[in-house]
């Protein structure tokens, strides 16, 4: 991408200039300066004083003169700024609450030079990784004389297109300097140059090209870029189609200007560009400069290239920083959404817990004690888990102990659940048995047939054996059935009675074994049976020890 840039001079170099001055002016009404120049104007890239308005602070002070170069205003640099930025700096300094103007400027060598005589410009092309860079350096014109170009003092570029120029002096004498173009396919004769003269005194210069002169199409398109017009791909194609090129790739200058006017009329109107400006871009004007000025210009060009590289590097870093900031912002939004979802899920879980607790509170009285135990165990588990989380980094042994206790309590919780189910089953059997007894004893006047049928129904409900056929031994049968019921209930209650911390489990093959969560051990034998066997073996040993002394005696 081609950009129009300007050669700027660093403030540190300007301060070494003997013409550099720093003045302070009392702030009363306003600065009263009219400026021109800037990096986006033909008079640039530097900013000069065009006029000092009467009644302003500078007019009252009298030290500034038209034609002086402004370096800074109130410590704000005027180097490398556009015309609009320069005006904005002056306006901003006026609005600040400061008691004085601090102005740095460079007094030009000749005091009678006016800004309107700043018409000698030079086009410098710099090649590098950023493509060709165009910069315009404004110079003051010297007293009327004939400028003869010298090879040693004229800056050379890769794409210079030089033509004949006519210079009018104060003696009304026209001198034509024919210069050949390296890239032009047609030599320019004296008839190819049209001179434009003015009647004003001093040095006046104007260059015009014959419309029949032919140039490379790339050179003319590059001139459009220098004028601030960036054609699109479609406009490039349309321009190549409408302009007829010969076998050498050259086109007529007049045809190109006419097609460009029709194709880029809006852009040309905005920048106020005509054929004269395009010819000025194509023709490198000759500047009277010595070797030191050429070296200074080359050094400034290198500084400008370095500054452009640094600016592009900073832009890339800024883009990368913006990209990272956007990425972090997106990640933060995602984290916030996830946190919000977790909070909502937690609230839903809490609501479900409250509903479960309400349902448990509404259960019958037999389950109240069990629920109380469950709540206490849950609170204890929560407390132990909290303690485990708080002291996990401080004491690993305590963590292991807490884990064991949690596992034991969890085991006891599951055993309590099984006990509750066992109690419910036993209670249900007892209730059915009591209801059957009530039915039998409450209806003594019922016929034997009806009584036997009701007994059969009750027996099927309570899993009892049918009572006697004739009903004569009802009390004895009830007593017998009650004993059997007591045995079955007791068997249910004693069936899975495991000690504290013990729990039964099954292998993948379905073999039952027992886990002791307290000691972290397993056993194939029921812990109660192992204890009984151990006690019996101890008793046998004691008996044997007692029998041995008796035999000896």
UniProtKB/Swiss-Prot annotation:
PROSITE patterns named among the record's database cross-references: PDZ, WW_DOMAIN_1, WW_DOMAIN_2
Superkingdom classification of source: Eukaryota
Listed GO CC annotations: cytoplasmic vesicle; extracellular exosome; phagocytic vesicle
Post-translation changes: Phosphorylated on Ser-99 by PKB/AKT2 after insulin treatment. Phosphorylation on Ser-99 abolishes the interaction with STX4A.
Coiled coil: 291-417
Main location (coarse class): cytoplasm
InterPro entries according to UniProt: PDZ, PDZ_scaffold, PDZ_sf, WW_dom, WW_dom_sf
WW domain mapped to chain residues: 496-529
Pfam family name, one: PDZ
GO molecular function: syntaxin binding
Domain PDZ: 19-105
Any GO BP: positive regulation of cell cycle G1/S phase transition
Keyword Lipid metabolism: no
Disulfide pairings: none
Keyword terms of this UniProt record: Coiled coil, Cytoplasm, Phosphoprotein, Repeat
Subunit structure: Interacts with STX4A.
Task of the protein: Plays a role in the translocation of transport vesicles from the cytoplasm to the plasma membrane. Inhibits the translocation of SLC2A4 from intracellular vesicles to the plasma membrane by STX4A binding and preventing the interaction between STX4A and VAMP2. Stimulation with insulin disrupts the interaction with STX4A, leading to increased levels of SLC2A4 at the plasma membrane. May also play a role in the regulation of insulin release by pancreatic beta cells after stimulation by glucose.
Annotated protein name in UniProt: Syntaxin-binding protein 4
Species this chain originates from: Homo sapiens
Taxonomic classification: Eukaryota, Metazoa, Chordata, Craniata, Vertebrata
